[in-house]
Amino acid sequence: MTNLRKSHPLMKIVNHTFIDLPTPSSISAWWNFGSLLGICLLLQILTGLFLAMHYSSDTSTAFSSVAHICRDVNYGWLIRYLHANGASMFFICLFLHIGRGTYYGSYTLSETWNIGILLVFSTMATAFLGYVLPWGQMSFWGATVITNLLSAIPYIGTTLVEWIWGGFSVDKATLSRFFAFHFIMPFIITALVMVHLLFLHETGSNNPTGLNSNADKIPFHPYYTIKDILGFVLLCFILLSLTLFTPDLLGDPDNYTPANPLNTPPHIKPEWYFLFAYAILRSIPNKLGGVIALILSILILIILPLLHTSPLRSLTFRPFSQCLFWILVADLITLTWIGGQPVEHPFIIIGQAASILYFSIFLILMPLAGILENKIMKM
């Protein structure tokens, strides 16, 4: 009798994905973030489901329903803060996953990479919708400012914004639809994750050398299932430390004030994981130009395969490109810091310089470094 996991139609899919999957023997801990993202997604769906049972998507009761969850529901405070800080962990893993893909040239697997970028946009949209739901000051004004950006679209902009709002301002209709979309989006993300994995398993994983590893592969289980447990334990430790000791560390104090359309907070800003894109948006004085730059800050990842000028896939053996990569990381940290600062001197000029450097590294410096390294290798 054949093994059930190799003969049963459903078990076969699981077997080919998590058990007998041929995996390069040289992949490092940087390849752990895919499975960690899966765990984060599962955690967000479960905690979100329990929060949705007690949440009210009406403007008059939304804020008090979140307070009710934290005060009266059994372990409601834990579920709420696991969900909020789980989103932060999700984005930390996401940024590290993209960083690893950029460093090791995983963007050459174009279908997997493009679905991944679609996943980034979906995750960012979901996080934005979720940030509006507690209906605090920053929720309301964040929703107003970010949705208002669509009015920069020529001709249809204003109509589009009013259509999204369901009226002439962010109100009850907006909150109801944002809650509905926030609920459905994680399931769309889960479907996209399956497509992402499907394309990945068509080509096989990349590895730190960037070379073909068909001659040296090992089964995923038990080697990488055991290895992934370490990442899982670290993720749980960081998430629980955040949730139990400093649950509001990454949040905004303004969100503990109920939404008030008549009182604008002194500094409107999104969650920390959007600050780099927000800084790029603010660094351009023109509204439409800022919106285009905001979208391009993520969309630029799509053209990375076209900007790849080196015969080597990974940056492991490319010192100039490595320097540029770490300058890019420092630049992103600078942009994140600038996004959280008020719009005044010297933050404006620092943000503009960091934004120019961000696009220059991708579009000009990285391709030039690849060409230079080619010439040095041929000498």
Swiss-Prot record:
What protein am I looking at? Cytochrome b
What InterPro entries does the record point to? Cyt_b/b6_C, Cyt_b/b6_C_sf, Cyt_b/b6_N, Cytb/b6-like_sf, Cytochrome_b, Cytochrome_b_C_euk/bac, Cytochrome_b_N_euk/bac, Di-haem_cyt_TM
The cofactor note from the UniProt entry for this protein is: Binds 2 heme b groups non-covalently.
- Species source reads Tachyoryctes splendens
Recite the other comments: Heme 1 (or BL or b562) is low-potential and absorbs at about 562 nm, and heme 2 (or BH or b566) is high-potential and absorbs at about 566 nm.
- What is the role of the protein in this entry? Component of the ubiquinol-cytochrome c reductase complex (complex III or cytochrome b-c1 complex) that is part of the mitochondrial respiratory chain. The b-c1 complex mediates electron transfer from ubiquinol to cytochrome c. Contributes to the generation of a proton gradient across the mitochondrial membrane that is then used for ATP synthesis.
Chief subcellular location: mitochondrion
Q: Which SUPFAM superfamilies match?
A: a domain/subunit of cytochrome bc1 complex (Ubiquinol-cytochrome c reductase) (SSF81648), Transmembrane di-heme cytochromes (SSF81342)
List the Gene3D superfamilies hit by this protein, alphabetically.
Cytochrome Bc1 Complex, Chain C
UniProt GO cellular component terms: mitochondrial inner membrane; respiratory chain complex III
